[in-house]
Design a protein with these regions (language model features):
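Proline-aspartate-enriched helix->loop->beta-strand connector
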Residues: 122-128, 144, 257, 261-266
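Alpha-helical, coiled-coil/dimerization segments enriched in small aliphatic residues
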Residues: 92-95, 218-248, 311
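Ligand-binding pocket segment of bilobal, Venus flytrap-like solute-binding proteins
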Residues: 198, 211-217, 234, 245-275
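Structured C-terminal subdomain patch of bacterial secreted/periplasmic proteins
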Residues: 263-337
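Extracytoplasmic substrate-binding proteins
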Residues: 56, 135, 144-212, 304, ...
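Short helix-initiation/N-cap motifs at beta->coil->alpha
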Residues: 52-54, 107-114, 243-252
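A short, structured surface patch at a secondary-structure boundary
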Residues: 64-65, 70-117, 121, 125
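Bacterial Sec-exported substrate-binding components of ABC uptake systems
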Residues: 2-14, 18-71, 178-207, 268-281, ...
Length: 337
């Protein structure tokens, strides 16, 4: 599938040089200026072809009115100074304020999307993904003149390569190739650190704390943590048949988690990202500390618990995973000393 933005108007200029009485240096400067102008014109009229989850997408450059529905992109784009004309503001991590203004149209959330607001923002590029992946066809229908990019990590593909694929494509689209390369280098360094720090035998349990409850995040499939079991070669303390990527974790009893007696527990505090300002919010650390069934678990008694950044649930960008991997590496390295 290929969708192309309307061709940009090419700016042409005619430069007349008065050769008589001009010095050689003036000729050189004029030639250089004309060359620069031509180069700029070509750049402004160029395009880039990106291979996304639906095929080849041609994006005209420079992008003037980008919109994004993919949570994995917000921190990256904000750090790069990329403005957006529309975003699902309820889903933008609270740690990111670049898209809070009235100049950014609010397109609701994945449960109650306001795609008409997206269309009214007249984007020339829409980045579709994560919670809005199912809205791809509707978005395509309502924004026929926009290029659509869907870079959601694909099932069956290596998760690290998928994160890198996304940030590489964003770098190409927004002229931030060097910045994208640096994010990838930082991510790969963190991944290697965590791999090298793991002793290869300690058992690991991953959980999601939501609403004061502790949910199980299984190897491979579990939300946030699942792919890291494969990337780092972690030994699961417990494997449950039919585990899912449920946003609150799978319903496995805390007693069953405790009986598996993990050496390490990886924790994602879902509520920290969405309800931390509410009076009944209880931090994940307090939930775990207050759960009687877990108090004799090795990970608890040895204080071998790693917490994901507070905004992980609404972020999950390559930057978030770099932070998570470095935290895991720090913890594993500390346990060896």
């Amino acid at each position: 599938m290929s969708r192309k933005l309307p061709a940009l108007l090419a700016l042409s200029a005619t430069v007349s040089l008065a050769l008589a009485g001009c010095s050689g240096s003036t000729d050189s400067a004029s030639t250089s200026a004309a060359s620069d102008a031509a180069s700029t014109s070509v750049s402004q009229a160029s395009s880039v072809t990106i291979e996304d989850n639906h095929g080849s997408v041609e994006v005209s450059l420079p992008v003037q009115r980008a919109a994004s529905t993919d949570n994995r992109t917000f921190e990256v784009l904000a750090d790069w100074g990329v403005p957006l004309v529309a975003a699902p503001k309820q889903l933008v991590p609270s740690s990111i304020t670049a898209y809070d203004g009235d100049d950014v149209a609010d397109i609701g959330n994945h449960r109650e999307p306001d795609l008409e607001a997206l269309a009214a923002a007249e984007p020339d590029l829409v980045i579709v993904g994560q919670r809005f992946s199912d809205q791809y066809d509707s978005i395509a229908e309502l924004t026929p003149d926009a290029a659509l990019l869907d870079l959601e990590p694909r099932d069956g593909e290596s998760f690290d390569a998928e994160l890198e694929r996304q940030v590489t494509a964003l770098g190409q689209v927004f002229g931030k190739e060097a910045e994208a390369d640096q994010l990838i280098a930082d991510f790969e360094d963190a991944l290697e650190r965590a791999k090298n720090a793991y002793d290869g035998s300690s058992t690991v349990m991953a959980v999601i704390v939501s609403g004061g409850e502790i949910g199980y995040s299984g190897p491979t499939t579990g939300r946030t943590w699942g792919p890291l079991f494969d990337l780092l070669g972690l030994e699961p303390a417990l494997e449950v048949e039919g585990s899912t990527d449920d946003h609150q974790g799978d319903d496995v009893s805390v007693e069953q988690i405790a009986e598996s007696n993990p050496d390490w527990i990886l924790v994602m505090d879902r509520d920290a990202a969405i309800t931390a300002d509410e009076p009944d919010y209880t931090p994940a650390a307090d939930v775990i500390a207050g759960n009687a069934a877990l108090q004799n678990v090795t990970a608890v008694t040895s204080e071998q618990i790693v917490y994901a950044p507070d905004d992980t649930y609404t972020n999950e960008s390559i930057i978030t995973y770099t932070e998570i991997l470095n935290s895991i590496a720090d913890a594993f390295e500390g346990a060896q000393n």
